[in-house]
Amino acid sequence: SFVDKNRIGIWGWSFGGFNTLMSMSEGRAVFKAGVAVAPPTNWKYYDTVYTERYMRTPKENPDGYALNPIERAGKLQGALLICHGSADDNVQPQNTFEYAEALVQADKDFKENYYTNRNHGISGGNTRNHLMRQIANFFIKELK
C-alpha cells in the first residue's frame, strides 16, 4: 500500500476550509490532522447575495443552513489548526470565533492562529511566510 492510513492530513482555505472542517466532523476518523484557513462555518454569517443565490434563504432552506461545521463541532476527530485574519471582509472572523466556541463547549482540543489586520488572503510583510510555516510545522508534528 502506498498510503499510510495513520498519517493522512487535510487542509483548505475559505470554502476548502469549510470542506476540511466538514470532512473532519463526519464521524469517521479518516484524517489524523487538518488545517482550516478562513473557513465559513455557518452560512448565516456569509454574504447573503452569494449564499442565497445557491441556498435560498434560511427560512426556505433550514436543512441546508443547518449543515455546517458549527453544528458538527462535537464530532470533530483529529488534530485541528484553524487560522483567520482579523480584517477578513470576505469570510468574517465571527465564523472562526463561533466555531472555536462550539469546539470549546464540545470539549475539543484545537489550536488557533489569528493574524491582526490581515484580510482573507492573510498576506503582507512576513505574514504569509509565518502562516505557511505554522501549517507545515503543524503537519510535521501531527503526522509523524
Over which residues does each language-model region extend?
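Active-site-proximal cap/loop segments of hydrolase catalytic domains
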Residues: 1-144
